[in-house]
Swiss-Prot record:
This is Ubiquinone biosynthesis O-methyltransferase. O-methyltransferase that catalyzes the 2 O-methylation steps in the ubiquinone biosynthetic pathway. SUPFAM superfamilies: S-adenosyl-L-methionine-dependent methyltransferases. GO terms for biological process: methylation. The gene is ubiG. It comes from Pseudomonas savastanoi pv. phaseolicola (strain 1448A / Race 6).
Length: 232
């Protein structure tokens, strides 16, 4: 059985044409992207690395990593976002290979092929996040690193990521997130360790509605990223 939620894909299919509009529903992704790319680049040195971006959507992260000198492949199950990603790279001149395939199927094809695997803002949109994490482990080379980001599951996250972002500040379309699918850092850490990955670092992202800016922080109460290592 495929680890795909068609309803989740449909949400992003409907908005795909707005993916690269920095004032659209995807503004939060554009706003946090430099912070995320810098954080990853500081830890792995993207230049010259072979990178897989799992759940790449319209290619915002994929292109940013390619601009840092990485050879990037982006995979997603949304046909429309991938079409947007492919069109955008024609405009930008940034080279990324895009494929419509699940992480699990890609792991069958490409085991131990990547220096770095990224899976950002994707785990909370699939039925079985642990299956994706295991696939990421299989695709990264021994000694390589895997980065995940998602949203914590607690009252604060519900208030900020659902009520605040979707209903008050209108940063995201209503219904973008399902609180039940949010993932606690302890759960993500346990799934990562069960897959064979060693957790190296955890960082939070917070949003200030007054300045409309995001920043990296030790507060992992809402949005957070983790760095993991597959030991050599």
């Amino acid at each position: 059985m495929s680890n795909v939620d068609r309803a989740e894909i449909a949400k992003f299919e409907a908005l795909a044409h707005r993916w690269w509009d920095r004032e659209s529903e995807f503004k939060p992704l554009h706003d946090i992207n430099p912070l995320r790319v810098n954080w990853i680049d500081e830890r792995v040195g993207l230049a010259g690395k072979k990178v897989l971006d799992v759940g790449c959507g319209g290619g915002i992260l994929s292109e940013a990593m390619a601009l840092r000198g990485a050879t990037v492949t982006g995979i997603d199950m949304g046909e429309a976002p991938l079409a947007v990603a492919q069109l955008h790279q024609l405009e930008s001149g940034v080279s990324v290979e895009y494929r419509q395939i699940t992480a699990e199927d890609m792991a069958e094809e490409m085991p131990e092929q990547y220096d770095v695997v990224t899976c950002l803002e994707m785990l909370e949109h699939v039925p079985d996040p642990s299956s994706v994490i295991r696939a990421c482990y299989r695709m990264v080379k021994p000694g390589g690193q895997v980065f995940f980001s998602t949203i914590n599951r607690n009252p604060k996250a519900y208030l900020f990521a659902v009520v605040g972002a979707e209903y008050i500040l209108n940063l995201l379309p209503r219904g973008t997130h399902d609180f039940k699918k949010f993932i606690r850092p302890s759960e993500l850490g346990a799934w990562s360790r069960d897959a064979g990955l060693q957790v190296k670092d955890v960082i939070g992202l917070t949003y200030n509605p007054l300045t409309k800016h995001y920043k990296l922080t030790s507060d992992v109460g809402v949005n957070y990223m983790i760095q993991t290592l597959r030991e050599a």
